[in-house]
Regions:
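Short, solvent-exposed aromatic-acidic interface loops
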Residues: 77, 194-203
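Short capping/connector residues at structural and topological boundaries
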Residues: 46-48, 53, 123, 165, ...
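Low-complexity, flexible helical/coil segments
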Residues: 65-71, 95-100, 107-112, 183-188
């Protein structure tokens, strides 16, 4: 079963049936589902300054006939919500008729791994790494006045259901690690900043001894 329907009253086959029935007389369209999770952990002045986590999901239902485009969206993935969206689309396009274009060119190119960086490490291990960075930099001398380090992690899941039950999926990881250091000596301050990130897991950038 799709991850989008695990905690709802609708399953994949019901969603596919809704898409097929709604778009049967349309030129184009799809049900686009998206789930987005993000986290941020900031260490500053020898302590964890902030920690945030957000999670959102929803869908967009699109139907196209000729020059008319109908669109409905909701953050509630349920039978009733999909039914209302379907009714709204059909009402908008009821005077139009077309032939659905099923084909979508596929590249099947793999640009990044199918991973969830937020779940790839425990919260405690992320805190330990930030503390390790802080301790390492401060061990370089008393001129280290301030250290700020933070993790930023995102994971976005996308699923597109076409009227012929063709399902396209993509999981997009994104991580970033930033650190800034303020040095002070003889009343003079200097700041150094470094950052690294990409569509990978935390492990690709933060390893023991690195």
């Amino acid at each position: 079963m799709s991850n989008f329907f695990k905690e709802t009253d609708v399953d994949t086959s019901q969603a596919e049936a809704s898409v097929t029935e709604t778009l049967k007389n349309c030129d184009d369209g799809e049900l686009y589902l998206e789930n987005h999770k993000s986290e941020s952990i900031v260490l500053d002045d020898n302590k964890i300054k902030s920690s945030t986590y957000n999670s959102d999901q929803g869908y967009g239902f699109r139907a196209v006939t000729g020059e008319v485009v109908a669109y409905s969206h909701s953050n509630d993935i349920s039978k009733e919500s999909l039914r209302k969206s379907s009714d709204n689309l059909k009402e908008t396009l009821k005077s139009k008729k077309g032939t659905y274009n099923h084909e979508i060119p596929k590249t099947n190119s793999k640009y990044y791994e199918n991973i969830n960086p937020i779940e790839s490490k425990t919260f405690d291990s992320k805190i330990d790494l930030l503390n390790s960075v802080n301790n390492y930099l401060r061990s370089k001398g008393s001129i280290v006045n301030q250290v700020t380090a933070n993790f930023l992690g995102e994971h976005k899941s996308i699923e597109i259901i076409r009227s012929d039950n063709q399902v396209l999926k993509d999981d997009r990881p994104l991580v970033r690690f930033n650190v800034s250091v303020v040095l002070e000596k003889d009343g003079k301050k200097e700041t150094g900043v470094y950052g690294v990130g990409g569509r990978q897991s935390y492990d690709d950038y933060l390893k023991d001894g690195s």
